[in-house]
Amino acid sequence: MTTPHTPDPHELAALRERYRLERERRVRPDGAAQYRDADAEFGYYAADPHTEGPADRAPLHDLVDVVVIGGGFGGILTGARLRQQGVARVRIVEKGGDFGGTWYWNRYPGVHCDVESHVYLPMLDETGYVPEWKYAPGDEIRRHAVRIATRFDLYADALFSTGVTALTWDEASETWLVSTDRGDDFRAAYVVSATGTLTDPKLPGIPGIEDFAGHTFHTSRWDYAYTGGTPEGGMTRLVDKRVGIVGTGATGIQAIPMLAEDAGHLYVFQRTPSTVDERANRRTVPGDVGAGRAGWASERRDNFLRIVSGESAGRDLVADRWTTSAGLLEKLLPSFRRHGDRHTFEAAYEAADAAKMNELRARVDRCVTDPEAAEKLKPWYRYACKRPTFSDLYYPAFNRDNVTLVDTADTHGIERVTADGVVVGGTAYALDCLIFATGFNVGTSGIHSGRLPVRGRDGVHLLDRWRRQGPRTLHGFTSNGFPNLIQLGTLQNASSVNFTHILDEQAVHVAALVAAAEADDALIEPSPASEEAWLAVLAEGAPDHEWFHAECTPGYYNREGRGRPNGPIAYPHGAVAFHRLLGEWREKSLSEVLRSRTVPRA
């Protein structure tokens, strides 16, 4: 590939203006309120298509050591690391019918991971498994989740098709009362929230959505009974169907090429095009990744994290589009490590960003034969405004006669849904099937959604307290007034594009906290002073990203165009440094969060 042209100041100014105009075409006054939850009258969009229904069982009223809310990789890894620390009674509560989390739910055609499988799949060293593909399909990932759960005996106490509805601290017993939608009221010495960020599907609030007389579903609940086929394709029941799909983000990029092959006619309704870089997926053998060496997977995973976090790494073991574009992730990740003078960095960043985006727009012209369609598919915004996507199949799908791209930018999305189809720009599109690839309520699942009330000491409601004074944690995990409650996620810690690595580091930390508390017959609870000190760490050196996201095209990164305010939301020196900090803290300062019990552990 030729070296990208570096734009001059006049070209950069022209790009800024084009980006502004394209953003204004898409910003809606209702912001994130344009979406609705898949609940109440729309609850069927979130129903589980992979199980016939919850298995009959009596409600539980027992006591466990640890309850983990969520059976995705966060919950599985927490359970596994707790087992390694000798914790016996671990109960994972999961809304789905099996382990897997987002990989249990997302089985749409073409589903793959967008991070290399040899770094994405956790515990490869421990299980001895070597992925079969550079970028694993969903089924391989789901099977690995089950492999880990089986290896660490996590099925023994697991509750599937069960949602936690309330967490209440009982001071008299110093345990948490856990209530579920299956009538359970059991107790746990510790609670770990691992509900993930890609679990609750969202729908566009299009007028008339409930009036559609055809078939409809969300991609995270794919209806193969209607389409036929499998995630590998073969949707033979669509051969005579007019299919519409709404959404061209990470899911749409993967599902659209498969639908294009099988549908009688496919209409793709696009508000904002994604960046779509090359994928170059292929089968792999152990020798490709040095899998014969002890610790090979941890080495590869650590190498990838260093590069995409802005650290030096010597050589690039993964060598894909994530790593070669790593410098542009600074605006995507609040916890990216930055170097040098701010002004110099921003100038160089803008030039590199423009060169990369010009390269990606040129790729559209090379892949799409129709100039009008190609122009609609070009992304006019900065690289980190949306999560990058990767596919070698997406653009060629628009060269097919049975695929129509419908641009909805000027109408701020589909105008309305009718019994027969949808209307965009005054044009009616008749459909037999309408599929929503509209994503999830990112970052608002579980405790943060408000649908899971958590009451700590003196009946204090966690979210009420945070609404009044802002989130208060130590390292993002624990909070004063909520003993033995530990949260996984991205709040006030560090994240990265390879989220399973982050989750595994968090699981190791959780297991160490629980093991220390058990050894000392103690409760885990930071002091208010510890929380304040951590807020100060987060605030010092926090990135100024507010202006960047305010200029971005609308999406979930900037609250649909409302911007993302600066603040103490993430550790500002990178995930590698954060993991190092946690390790040193566990060695030297963990006892600071241990408080003596007043009631003996049952």
Residue ranges and their predicted role:
Residues 2-66, 83-210, 225, 235-240, ...:
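N-terminal FAD-binding dinucleotide-binding subdomain shared by FAD-dependent oxidases/monooxygenases
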Residues 82, 258-259:
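Aromatic pocket-lining residues of Rossmann-like dinucleotide-binding sites
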Residues 70-74, 248-249:
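Glycine-rich Rossmann-fold phosphate-binding loop(s) that bind the pyrophosphate
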Residues 243:
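Conserved class I S-adenosyl-L-methionine
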Residues 76, 253:
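Residues forming the Rossmann-fold NAD(P)(H) cofactor-binding site
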Residues 229-230:
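Acidic/histidine-rich helix-loop elements
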Residues 216:
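Conserved active-site neighborhood of enzyme catalytic/cofactor-binding cores
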